[in-house]
Amino acid sequence: LGFGGTRRDGVSTETGLRLAWGDDEPKPLWKAKVGAGYSSVIEAAGLAYTVGNANGKNTIFCLDANSGEKKWTHSFPCEKAPKYFDGGSRATPAVADGILYLASHEGAFFAFEAKTGKVLWSKDLIEDFNGRRPTWGFSGSPLVADGKVIVDTGSKDGALVAMDAKTGDLVWRG
């Protein structure tokens, strides 16, 4: 699961959704302060994930989707982007097969155990793949398919890289 839903096209296949609320509008169940950023929230196995930036650090939040209770967080150094406006992470994380994938706007890339937050592996998109930070920062959400996690590194040597989803080893670039 990642940005744009199960088919990554921004379309819900749910049926019977209530579209007209009138005065019977739903009330929020919970709210969480996560800092600045543009990451969407995703849900998998009853857990909600998003990223925020505060005090020169990005933090990935894992929250109980029903209660908002914080299950785990992981913070790492990452300044707000200096371009045009304040903001933190732009990419939405992705979850597949119990692993959460996250790309920061500065190029740090992580694979976490989705339930616990344990770091399984990490990469630096600039150092490891000769990547180039885009003007707006890395903002493409990872795509997980067929045992690979695919990201755009911005490299002149092949912008797209596919890494083994379990190990982070390079599978192909193009």
Residues covered by each model-derived region:
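Noncatalytic, solvent-exposed loop/strand surfaces
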Residues: L1-G174
